[in-house]
Every structure is written in structure tokens, then in C-alpha cells.
Amino acid sequence: MSQSANRLCRIDIDDSALPPPSPEIEQDRRVAVFDLLEDNSFTLPGREGQDVPPGPYALALAVREKRLVFDIATESGSKVAEFHLSLGPFRQTVKDYFQICTSYFDAVKRLPPAQIEAIDMARRGIHNEGARTLQERLEGKAEVDIDTARRLFTLICALVPG
């Protein structure tokens, strides 16, 4: 596990207002959380001349009033920041991601490896697009590397209806 202070040490997902995820999405979410906790890069920039308490940080993700909420606390639980992102920029990418995931899960059951690989490449491309969008939307609020953004995008998909 990365021991840098610029990381997430805990991730909570508030999906209490949502229907239960499919087994595949639930598995994606578990893997994303595990991978995030194993290795991530998450930095909060100072704002308006104020220093930010050093990490590691605990992240609570939720959707409230059609906005994605990042609630950030220190490892000990002291609130550090909260910011809200519009879901609009993510909606089409999330929809495309769910569609390609459905195709991928179906393909795994019945298609030859070459066709599965082609669908998986498309799935990864859409996933990367979502990660880049997330990095752009987090600009000035939090800095994350592409791998962290990819895993966070997976968690966003678990919170946003496709």
C-alpha cells in the first residue's frame, strides 16, 4: 500500500437512496475500492491561501440533489472539504459505459476471445474518457492521477443510473 500522505485511506459509498446494483457492478465496485486503497494519489490543493490538513484522507461519495458529492475528512474523521460536481458531464459517458459493460458481460458468456478483446478495448476507452472527465471536473478541488480517476469513475458509475 502506498504510504504517501497524498492518498485515500478509506472510501465510503452512500448508495442508500439507490436500487441495489447488479452483481457485476457490485463486483466492479469492490475491486475499485480494493485497488484504490492499495494504490492511489489524492491531493487537496490549498484554497484562498489556506493550508489543507495533510492526508491521508477518508472519502465519502454520494449523490444528493442530482450532484455528485465528495466529502473529504482526515484519517481521524475531521472534515476537510466537501465539493459537489454536476452529473451532467458524466451522464453520457456513464450510459455508454453501462451499455458496453452489458455487451462485455454477454460476450464473455458466448463469444470467442478475439471478439471479447475488441469489446474490452472499447470498454477501457470509455472508462478512460470518464476518468479524464473526472480529472477535469476535479481541477482546483482535488488532484488525482489517471489510475485513481479510473477507479473513482467506476464508483461514480455505481452511484449514477446508467
Curated annotation (Swiss-Prot):
Signal peptide limits: none
Region feature Disordered, mapped onto this chain: 1-22
Identify the domain of life.
Bacteria
Q: Name one Pfam family in it.
A: UPF0262
Per the record, the similarity remark reads: Belongs to the UPF0262 family.
HAMAP family referenced in this protein's UniProt entry, alphabetically: UPF0262 (MF_00678)
Q: What is this protein called?
A: UPF0262 protein Pden_1958
Q: Which organism is it from?
A: Paracoccus denitrificans (strain Pd 1222)
